[in-house]
Amino acid sequence: MAGVAGLAIGGASVLASCASDSSGASAADGGDLGTLKVQLSWIKNEEFAGEFFADSKGYFTEAGLAGVTLTPGPSTGVAELLSGSADVALSDAVSIGTAIAQQEAPLKIIGATYQKNPFTVLSIKTAGNIATPADLAGKKIGVQASNTSLFQALLAANGLSESDLTVVPVEYDPSVLVNGTVDGFIAYLTNEAITVAAEGYEVVNLPFADNGLPFVAETFSVSEQAIAEKRDALKAFLVAEIKGWTDAVNDPEAGAMLAVENYGKDLGLNEESSKKGATIQAEELVVSDETVSNGLFTISETLQSETIASLAGAGIDVTAEDLFDLTLLDEVYEENPELMKYAA
């Protein structure tokens, strides 16, 4: 899940319309490496600016792919990867780690768009005012189905359980927070937090990354079978994605407009909020001191260790070897060293 940057509160029908849209990138003739199916974690908003640049500028076909299909969520991508209906899923370390730990799912993370995850418990200062994990006690928290394992991980990492509060099943419309149905709402710092604040409310965030769960997110997640059978295609995909996200980092507002005017044109996205969300993700989530040194999507040994430790604190028992296979990305940068210089 991600949030709806600029999606008007009360826009559940907009979400429903996007969920029925099952294709995104256009396929071109040719392409020795075939077509890849990509499951997005959320709707086609600015969160996927890099993918939109890669598609619209022809980076996927330039890399040798016949095309890439972008299927909107919400989804963790686990079911799609295991069923074979997706070759790549934009997911997160908790969702993939949980599947590996609990189901022995043969999945791997091969890179991460977000060096820092943007999940938060969003509240309104004059209502829920959830500023610390202790503030969750006794509160009603709206949790979407795709975020159940994430919220359970947050509770476990902070010594809490669901019996300490009330979990309210919700969809992705933050109006339930505004109207008082819930005190807190699982959201993205770059999306719903902006949306609700834009409505004039003073918002309070409880970021997962600052409260026991500093895991990577918007991860490029694949099956071990895909790594074995489609390695060259996945590497080509990563090359195109690096180029796309280089553009998104250097011109976040243009990336936002690709969502507003093209890929998400039927969603009613708010231009100002979309630009703000795209800028925040470009400056605070996608890049870091480590990406400057190692390149976009890389996950340093330190960040791997922090991710594994955060999962362990939430009761998810996996090793770095279980969760990550960064050899494809290593090969991409070794073969294309010019891609390191994303900050043009």
What are these regions (language model features)?
Residues 193, 197-216:
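Extracytoplasmic/periplasmic substrate-binding proteins
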Residues 6, 27-169, 175-179, 183-187, ...:
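Short, glycine-/small- and polar/acidic-enriched structural segments
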Residues 230-314:
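Secondary-structure end/capping motifs
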Residues 59-64, 132, 210-213, 228, ...:
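Short, solvent-exposed loop/beta-turn-alpha elements that line the ligand-binding surface or hinge
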Residues 120-130, 216-232:
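A bilobed periplasmic-binding-protein/Venus flytrap-type ligand-binding module shared by bacterial periplasmic
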Residues 1-17:
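N-terminal export signals
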